[in-house]
């Protein structure tokens, strides 16, 4: 009897355990099923989104292939330039042969069936009619390629000199751009003539009669040296000789231009491609001279130079002070953007009254002369070619002209 009760109790206990286990199984099974369904639903949604994105990509790709890509103006100019380089590799007999000479090829020729070096401009720029060409010029035994794009009112490649003149109204007094001796000359102490090159800021001194642009460093960094330190027979010691052609300064400027100095760098290769040769005026001048047209200094000059120094007349013309007349006038320090306070720097003009003195801008900002063997800062001048294009900028120190 007791055994019967035990068996019944064991059976009830076992059934109770089975019921509890079943309840546990049912409770734990429900969340697992929900997670699985959610995972499958997420995968399905992800798959649908991925499929939609693939379809969109294919549609865009097909549209690009069938309709053609709409390039930016800068990209079109680069396409023009690259095509012209390939063109002249084939037609090298058409390249300019002499220094300064130019040759050009238009976009129609580059895109023609004969060459197929680029797509027609109509397929590169949509909803705008454009004409284009590339001018190649031989400068310092290198070929410089300049693309021109004219899309009417929408866009037009603009040379820097044109932009400078358009942004700086010609004035006859005060700060600004003046017409002097057939050139456009910046004068005054507050002028918007900053240009950004790879190594720093430069100032535009003037735009020449053939639209080239004379630059001088704003002098963020500098290098000092003698103008010349040779033995001078007239003076009886190594005071230097004030003739530019055989001077130490000429050698130093060549090293600066070629970037051969270890602790000073003025230019990058991309900057040199924008420069052109010029006549460097090296004529001597008296302290009392009042002719500031450049005729005195340019009575003697070196042609085909890539680097030089500022002339005395160019510095004098930078001042708007009416009393700045002769070479050593102290008034030339007034209203003159070329002045750098507490900084003395060499000019390219030598004194005409002896064989050892050269003019320099002293720490106060007016001209004095000293032995060529003196130590002063070198502030080189460079000439931007007239085909250099502007990318942006207003010419201010904070927003300088940026070149293409």
Task: Outline where the language-model segments fall.
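Hydrophobic alpha-helical membrane-insertion segments, chiefly the h-region
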Residues: 54-65
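Structured segments of extracytoplasmic/periplasmic soluble domains
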Residues: 83-90, 113-116, 207, 218, ...
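Short, surface-exposed interaction loops/tails
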Residues: 2-4, 124-158, 374, 378, ...
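Conserved hydrophobic/amphipathic alpha-helical signal-anchor segments
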Residues: 63-103
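N-terminal Sec-pathway targeting helices
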Residues: 36-54
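Collagenous Gly-X-Y triple-helix signature in extracellular proteins
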Residues: 154-404
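Extracellular/periplasmic head regions of type IV pilus-like filament subunits
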Residues: 96-133, 253, 299
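N-terminal targeting leaders characterized by basic, low-complexity, disordered sequences
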Residues: 1-32
């Amino acid at each position: 009897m007791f055994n019967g009760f035990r068996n019944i109790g064991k059976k009830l206990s076992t059934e109770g355990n089975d019921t509890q286990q079943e309840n546990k199984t049912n409770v734990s099974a429900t969340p697992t099923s929900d997670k699985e369904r959610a995972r499958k639903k997420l995968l399905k949604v992800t798959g649908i989104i991925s499929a939609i994105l693939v379809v969109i990509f294919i549609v865009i790709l097909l549209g690009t292939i069938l309709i053609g890509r709409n390039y930016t103006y800068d990209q079109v100019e680069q396409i023009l330039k690259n095509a012209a380089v390939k063109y002249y590799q084939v037609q090298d007999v058409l390249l300019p042969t002499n220094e300064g000479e130019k040759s050009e090829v238009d976009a129609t020729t580059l895109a023609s069936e004969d060459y197929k070096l680029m797509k027609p401009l109509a397929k590169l720029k949509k909803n705008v009619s454009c004409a284009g060409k590339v001018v190649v010029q031989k400068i310092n035994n290198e070929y410089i390629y300049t693309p021109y794009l004219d899309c009417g009112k929408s866009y037009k490649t603009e040379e820097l000199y044109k932009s400078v003149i358009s942004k700086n109204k010609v004035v006859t007094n005060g700060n600004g751009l003046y017409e002097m001796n057939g050139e456009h000359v910046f004068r005054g102490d507050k002028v918007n003539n900053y240009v950004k090159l790879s190594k720093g800021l430069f100032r535009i001194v003037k735009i020449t009669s053939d639209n080239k642009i004379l630059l001088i460093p704003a002098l963020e960094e500098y290098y000092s040296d003698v103008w010349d330190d040779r033995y001078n027979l007239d003076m009886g010691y190594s005071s230097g000789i004030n003739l530019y052609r055989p001077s130490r300064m000429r050698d130093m400027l060549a090293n600066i231009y070629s970037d051969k100095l270890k602790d000073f760098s003025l230019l990058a290769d991309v900057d040199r491609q924008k420069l052109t040769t010029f006549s460097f005026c090296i004529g001597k001048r008296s302290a009392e001279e009042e002719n500031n047209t450049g005729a005195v200094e340019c009575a003697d000059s070196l042609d085909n130079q890539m680097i030089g120094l500022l002339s005395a007349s160019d510095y004098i013309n930078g001042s708007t002070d009416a009393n700045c007349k002769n070479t050593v006038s102290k008034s030339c320090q007034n209203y003159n953007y070329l002045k750098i306070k507490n900084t003395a720097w060499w000019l390219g003009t030598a004194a005409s009254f002896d064989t050892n003195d050269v003019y320099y801008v002293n720490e106060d900002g007016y001209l004095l002369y000293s032995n060529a063997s003196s130590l002063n800062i070198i502030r080189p001048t460079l000439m931007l070619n007239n085909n250099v294009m502007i990318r942006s900028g207003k010419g201010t120190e904070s927003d300088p002209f940026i070149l293409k």
